[in-house]
Each structure stands twice: as C-alpha cells, then as structure tokens.
C-alpha cells in the first residue's frame, strides 16, 4: 500500500556526503563554525541529497492543507467554522499573507481541501496579480475525505481508513509537486480549531502534559484557553492513544490536515527532498511522520519557532532547531516562507563561496 511503500523508501542520511560537506565548510573563506546553524543545515541537506553541494532549494512549493474539526463544537475558538472555506477563496484569489510571502520568494501555492466542512466559497480564477514571479497562480486540489472531523471528545475524530486516506493524499501531493520540479516543499495549513488536535497529537507523541502544549491559537481568552486544555485532557482520557500506532493516534485525536501534512513530510523524505516546517500544526504532523518513519526527520527543517508552546516541545522532541523566531502564530505556511531564504543561503554558501586555497587567502 502507498503508506507502507513510502515509509519503506525512507532511508538515513548519506554519511559520506555529510563528511564531504563538513570538510568543505572547514575550507571556505570564513572562520570555522562562523555560520552556526547554517553550517549544520548545509551538511544535513548534503546528507539528504547524497551529494555535496546539495541542490539549491529552488523552485519551492507550498502545500496548504485545509480541514475543519468537530471539536469546534466544544467552544475552543471564537472564530466561526465557515472561515476555513472562506480563507480558501482568499488563498486562491491571492489575498492572504501566505500569498504575499510566496510572491516575495517565488514559491508556488497549492491549496488542498482534505476536510473542509462546507464547500469553499468565492473560488474564482486567480487574478494575474496573484501570480508569483514564475507566472504560477494559486491552485486548488479537491481531495475532501469527509466534511470535517468528528468531535474527538465524543468519539474518534476519524476512522483508520479516513486517517490513512489523508496521509496518502499528502504523499500524493508531495509526489506531484516534486515531479513538477519542486526542490523543496513547505508546509501550510488552514482549519479553524486545528490547534486543539495539534496539542493532542503533541501531548501523545512527546509524552507531555496537555497544559504544557496547549496554546491560545488565534488568541483566546483565559477561560477559553482553560476549556481547551480540558478538552485535550478529555480526549486523551477517552481514547488513550498509543504513540507506537501513529495511524491510530491521527484517527483518534488528529485532523485531516494534520494527517495529510504527515503524508507530505513522508513523501518528501522518500524522495529525499527537504520539507520546511511551518508552525505548530506542521510540528505536530512531523511528530506523526517520525513515528511512521524515524529517518524522516532527516528531511525536516524547522522554519520557525511558533509562539504556541506545543511547537517548542515538538521541535525539541524531533531534535530540530528553528531557523527564525519572530513571535508568529498565523500558520498558512507563512513562517516557513520567511525561513526559505535562510535555507537557500545555507546551500548557496557551499555552491559559491571560495576556499582559502582557491582564493589565495591565508589561514591562521
């Protein structure tokens, strides 16, 4: 089956390529280690690609997975559920923050409806001004598995078959984007209420207390935040999800966009293409992906540190260092897009910077 074939194809980083990259970094015209995290990142990307220098992360593709959540009925957010579908229309019209940042970086935007409760509204042909520098306009992939998840405090959010379908949708999207030429994939998400299942997923996979991983999402007040924590606790008590069964965890307390993002990450890792994580939704999905295939972490790059507390817990569990910390909590892929030039810079150093010998520069 697709999921099993994909996880079987995910292997470890190429140690020889990493050693070559580390050696090259030590001979470039700069003090050893002076580029900090960027040096470590360039070495890891060489290991992922199996060659030094690794390919430049161009062109880039953002995949924004959208879904709704039955737990919305528990009052975990003041935002109405129909905003999810309305925002899809905004993405396709080029009017969201993700579109502005994508135009700045030249990344394409693909919006994937995996579980929106109501058909997306205001979907029209994207205007010319929504296009990136390459001329690509935002596009919609209709892959709705069900019209929103079930309320995870009452029953499992998804069946195992639905969770598998979402994961495999993400794998297919990764395959399609890479086949179309993408050299790096960026995670995006849209779903009113989706930080609640994200907190539940992180609590399970990181073995953390819900109070330490449940944040304020869109900025809820204290009573709503406390209710949200209790909702996560109640869901975990009801389902007792087993972190050794990632498909079961996604079915019990996940969301369709979380499962699809896990699939996107697995698909990228199987193709040995880096995937740049956005915020807490992507971080929770990355934990699920790592539970399916531990070596998938080799393809993951943490774009930024979300202010959602679960993001820090998840990244620590994954062993990933966020590239930027700007106090973001929007989602959509915005933080990943802001970090994209940092990733490109890390790789470009290996391609373009002279060595001490080639430049005729003396060493200490």
Curated annotation (Swiss-Prot):
- Active-site residues, Swiss-Prot/TrEMBL: 332
Q: A Pfam family name for this chain?
A: DBI_PRT
Which CDD domains does the UniProt entry name for this protein?
Answer: DMB-PRT_CobT (cd02439)
EC number of this enzyme: 2.4.2.21
- Keywords of the record: Cobalamin biosynthesis, Glycosyltransferase, Transferase
Instruction: Quote one Gene Ontology molecular function term.
Output: nicotinate-nucleotide-dimethylbenzimidazole phosphoribosyltransferase activity
**A biological process from GO:** cobalamin biosynthetic process
Q: Which reaction does it catalyse?
A: 5,6-dimethylbenzimidazole + nicotinate beta-D-ribonucleotide = alpha-ribazole 5'-phosphate + nicotinate + H(+)
Please name the NCBIfam families in this protein's record: cobT_DBIPRT (TIGR03160), PRK00105.1 (NF000996)
The function of this protein is: Catalyzes the synthesis of alpha-ribazole-5'-phosphate from nicotinate mononucleotide (NAMN) and 5,6-dimethylbenzimidazole (DMB).
Similarity field: Belongs to the CobT family.
Query: Which named protein is this?
Result: Nicotinate-nucleotide--dimethylbenzimidazole phosphoribosyltransferase
